[in-house]
A protein has these predicted regions:
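Compositionally biased non-globular segments, especially hydrophobic aliphatic-rich helices
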Residues: 29, 43-44
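Bacterial lipoprotein signal-peptidase II cleavage site
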Residues: 33-40
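N-terminal secretory signal peptides
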Residues: 1-10, 14-28
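General helical structural elements
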Residues: 16-17, 38, 90, 453
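Generic alpha-helix initiation/capping and coil-helix boundary signal
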Residues: 12, 19, 33, 49-52, ...
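Small-side-chain structural scaffolding
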Residues: 19-21, 26, 31, 56-59, ...
Length: 470
């Protein structure tokens, strides 16, 4: 059976920054760098000299996201064409780990090596959330237009929303009404999300997906509004396992070839200078390094990526907050770990995913109490989804998998909200929209999703309430 994919990004495993990850030891000395966005990040790659295996290990961690992205692209749809997810998962789904019940995905690989590519997002009813997260090939979120922040430089604010993704160094002229979206690499990935309000809403979302347009700039100019046809979803491949199966020579040769197409950022120059001693450069080759050294570096690097734990992770009232994803600077360890656990990590301003790890004990009934005015602060919407220990949705006769989004929660007379968390169907005194089923026995997790969270959620001024026994 092929391993399951993760539902928040398009990745492999279930517990992103979950409890139980091993502590991570930095690669020798620690250097600090400043990302192109201006934020300071801790580097996981030392610029000090070292033996060949140590340097190659650092290079593996550095290049892992690039190689993983390329393998994922290779097994995806053709470039500059959308592929759409069309269904909401249920407990019978055993493909996606930690799937969400809130959005449908529309994905497209971009190839800008010939010319810019135009994306048009259709107009839709007010209040429907959408996000067109666009990552460079190093998994940094390079652009993130959304319904909350459409980032238009021109055109109608109510849609359609028309953007042109520009390759590095492009200085041509765009037609009026198209917002430029420069990208740092000539290949990139759009991971689009569109809000869906339950099964009955699927036809409306399918129509929106069908209204997404993507085309090379020259084709768009010749026939405005026309786009490349959507692609059939390709067979699922486990890119993480494919990369894990590469020997040292295969991995580093591929990394060097890819860096010639999608170059690293200027801030990476110190690390690249160190790797150059082994021939690991854009378009280069590590051919002079013994195969056993490269194979050992791959094994060491794989262990470092798998066992990474970011010291910036936070636990608030029992809820685990991962460190900010999507913009990594020179924190190469975090970048590689997030890529392995699930490509498509959001920027905090687009989504937060506090996660609670629990176990059923006592009478098996728990409660989440939101004080008046203290529901999750968002500019879009929020939800809480329950998962079994294996990360899949929990079977229950009512087919209830989440609360907060598809049905409005009921408030108490004082304006507070109580969510009842238990396996048994609640009494009539509890609103159906306020019940979240969990397993009868054993471990479970809750993931709270905040779409377009407000600043108070991002800086932790607002804190989620603790899960308590009833």
């Amino acid at each position: 059976m092929s391993p399951a994919l993760r539902g928040d990004g398009i990745g492999r495993r279930s517990m992103l920054f979950g409890a139980g990850a091993l502590a991570f030891t930095a690669f020798g000395l620690t250097a600090c760098g400043r990302s192109e966005s201006g934020s300071t990040a801790t580097s996981s790659v030392t610029t000090a000299p070292g033996d060949d295996r140590s340097v190659a290990t650092d290079a593996y961690v550095f290049g892992y996201p690039l190689v993983l992205m390329d393998v994922t692209r290779e097994h995806g749809a053709p470039a500059n064409r959308f592929e759409h997810s069309r269904t909401l998962p249920d407990a019978a789904n055993r493909t996606l780990v930690r799937p969400n019940q809130d959005t449908l995905y529309s994905k497209a690989w971009l190839d800008l090596r010939t010319e810019p590519v135009v994306l048009e997002v259709p107009a839709m009813e007010s209040g429907r959330y959408w996000l067109m997260e666009t990552m460079d090939m190093w998994t940094n979120v390079a652009q993130n237009p959304s319904s909350v922040r459409p980032q238009l430089s021109s055109g109608a604010t109510g849609g359609p929303f028309t953007y042109a993704f520009l390759p590095p160094g492009w200085n041509g002229t765009l037609p009026p009404g198209i917002t430029p979206m420069p990208l740092p690499t000539p290949q990139a990935w759009i991971l689009g999300r569109i809000q869906v309000d339950g099964q009955a809403d699927l036809p409306a979302v399918h129509a929106i997906q069908d209204g997404l347009r993507i085309a090379p700039l020259s084709a768009w100019v010749a026939n405005p509004g026309a786009g490349n046809p959507a692609a059939e979803s390709p067979s699922t491949a486990d890119a993480v396992q494919i990369v894990a199966g590469m020997d040292g020579r295969a991995f580093f040769d591929r990394m060097c070839a890819l860096m010639a197409i999608d170059p690293p950022a200027p801030v990476d120059a110190p690390a690249l200078q160190r790797f150059a001693a082994l021939g690991i450069t854009p378009g280069g080759s590590a051919g002079k390094i013994a195969a056993e050294v490269l194979d050992g570096a791959v094994a060491d690097g794989r262990g470092r990526v798998e066992n990474y734990r970011d010291p910036a992770n936070t636990i608030i009232e029992g809820w685990n907050y991962s460190a900010a994803a999507g913009r990594y600077g020179t924190n190469y360890g975090q970048r590689a770990y997030v890529a392995r656990m699930g490509l498509g990590g959001n920027l905090p301003e687009d989504a937060l995913y506090p996660t609670y790890y629990g176990s059923v004990d006592g009478n098996g009934s728990m409660r989440l109490h939101f004080a008046p005015g203290q529901l999750p602060p968002v500019d879009a919407f929020w939800s809480i989804t329950a998962y079994a220990a294996d990360g899949f949705l929990i079977p229950n006769p009512a087919s209830v998998y989440s609360v907060g989004h598809q049905l409005p929660v009921a408030t108490n007379p004082d304006g507070s909200v109580d969510i009842l968390i238990q396996n048994a169907h609640p009494t009539a005194q509890v609103a159906a929209a306020n019940w979240l089923p969990i397993p009868e026995h054993g471990k479970f997790t809750l993931t709270m999703r905040l779409y377009a969270p407000q600043p108070t959620a991002i800086d932790h001024t607002w804190k989620p309430p603790a899960v308590t026994n009833t």
